[in-house]
Amino acid sequence: GERDYGVGPVPAAALTALVCAGLAAAVGARPELAVWLLLVPLGVLLTAVDLAVNRLPDVLTLPMAGGAAVLLGAAALLPHSAGSWPRALLGGAVLGGGYLVLFLISPSGMGFGDVKLALTLGVALGWYGWGVLFVGAFAGLLLGCCWGAVLVLTRRAGRGTAMAFGPFMILGAGAGLVLGALGAG
């Protein structure tokens, strides 16, 4: 049957529209905007799912990673694109590899869904450069760690409590994309 992910269709659509409008304002009429506008609804959906069930399903994360790589490859062929497709692919490998190392060090501390999500976010952030990749990835880690600290300090969670980390990764990557787009403009 249907599953309730805690966010109704109207708030999810409003959030998606707001994020798309912000990215459109930052990116302008460049080819990569179409890619970001296709990825945003998936990011919002992944955020809702992860917050509800602490899981990032393969049915969303894997096609999202492949789609981002292929679509940015097409965007790179068009005039006025502001990024680098080879660097985007390397960014996916670097961020995905970094999260894989974190997962291997502590499988109970990092879900494998986060590793797969990192592939997509690395591709997207890598498009605009290594600095953008670092800022977006670090912002996600910092936001997640701060939220985890708040939960522990308010005794709403302990050190071993599972926490949805994907939403923070996505939020950090979104901030990185906006900064990258503005810097490329």
What spans do the regions from the language model cover?
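A membrane-topology feature that recognizes alpha-helical transmembrane segments
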Residues: 1-185
